[in-house]
Each structure stands twice: as structure tokens, then as C-alpha cells.
Amino acid sequence: MIVQSKIDDYSENHSRKTTTEVLLKIRTALSYAYGHGLLATDFGKLVKTRGKVSEKKNISLSITEMKILRQYLLRAHKDEFEIMVLLALETGARRGELLGLRPEYIEENAILIRESISPTSNDTELKTKKSRRKLSLNHDVWELLMSIKPKKNGYIFDPDGFKQSEKLGRLLERLGLSKTTFHGLRDTHASFLFSSEKISIDYISQRLGHSNIQTTMNYYLTLMPEKKHQQDADALDFLNSLSE
């Protein structure tokens, strides 16, 4: 089949996700052509998706790696970008939320999330109402944040072409740590909170700015699948105990 052959060729240099998106458009066109009598059969459903499964980029750093990175960042406090990385690791805030920080959004040992800067839009509104929140900081992190001189546009951090993940990759490589993206720092913060039995899921949901608890629960199961397996085992043990 010619269409399948073309899809196979395309998939050699594209991810499975991208190939699937292209194939869906082709199927829609073929279905339209069939519906208007331009094709004898609607063979689009027979065409299969190929392509490479992309490696997950937003991986969480291990607790050990998190400690190494945090200790380095607390020492290397002259670089504005590294302070931003420390803030992301410390708060779990999204990149856009940190770029949206202004001096008036900083309180003693805390920051207020009120805006979000995006590379694709001039709209600085937050994703949801729950995204509007107050995040506590350790005093040493707060002092480093206060050392940054605000920019002429009123914000604390320079978007710097939105290349934070690239710069982070180079920093992690230099420190010999696993490579992740800026969003991976948010995942790392969340994983650290999830690992503590003393911190409630409600608090974590509020700190991450999730729209509801279910979003946080789904996030939890994605980040820590081994916990789900353990809970499955605990649930079965509990049910078995009822018959003893």
C-alpha cells in the first residue's frame, strides 16, 4: 500500500506521536474522499502508525541528585539562572510562573504566584484559579531571590529566549546528574513531597496549583508507580485478612 509505505518513510525521522498526528489527518481526508464517492473504499483505518517512541524528558531527579543540585545552587548564588533553578526545585512552581514574578509578589520567606509568562502568548493569566497561590520558602533561598535586581519590565527574571531547559541540561551534565527539563524540576519537587508520609495530598495539591485533588492523584501515580503496586498489595492483604 502506497500510503503505508509513505507513513513508514516518514516515521523513520519522526516520533510516534508526530506520525500519529499526521496519520489522523490523512485518515480524515481519506474518509472525506470516500464519503464523496472519490474512493472505492475507506482504507485509512488499515494504515498503521510507526515511529520511535520518544524518551521521556521530564524525568524526576532522585532524592540524592536533588540534594547534590540543591547544595550546589545554594553555594553558587551569583548566577541569576541558578537562583531560578533553585526556586523551581524549592517550590515546584512552573517555569512561566517563576518568570511572572515581580517584586510585589515577594513576601517574607514566601512568593505569590499571580502571573505566568509564556513563549507563545502575551496573556499572563494563570492556568486555573487554583494556580493562584502562596509558596513558602526557606530563608536562605528567599535571601538569594531578594538579591536579584528587577528588570526594566518589572519582572524579576529575564525570559532569556525561554532556553531554561537547555541551560539546565548543561548544568546537570556539568554536575554529573541525570538530564531533565525545567518541568522535571517540578516533578522532582512533587516526588520529594510525595515520599513524605507527613505531608498530606491536599497540601501537595495546593502547593502545585492543581485544579483538583484528582489531578494530583493522577500525577502521583504517574511519578511513583511503585507506590501504586505497594498499595495494591496492601489492599489485597487487608481484604484477605477479612476472611481469616
Segments the model singles out, each with a brief description of its role:
Residues 69-72, 123-125, 218, 222-244:
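DNA/chromatin major-groove-contacting recognition/catalytic segments
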Residues 12, 80, 91, 178, ...:
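Flexible coil/turn residues that form the inter-helical turn or adjacent wing/linker of helix-turn-helix
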Residues 16, 20-22, 35-41, 45-95, ...:
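Basic, Lys/Arg- and aromatic-enriched nucleic-acid-binding interface segment
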Residues 1-38, 55, 76-77, 158-163, ...:
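N-terminal core-binding DNA-recognition domain of tyrosine site-specific recombinases/integrases
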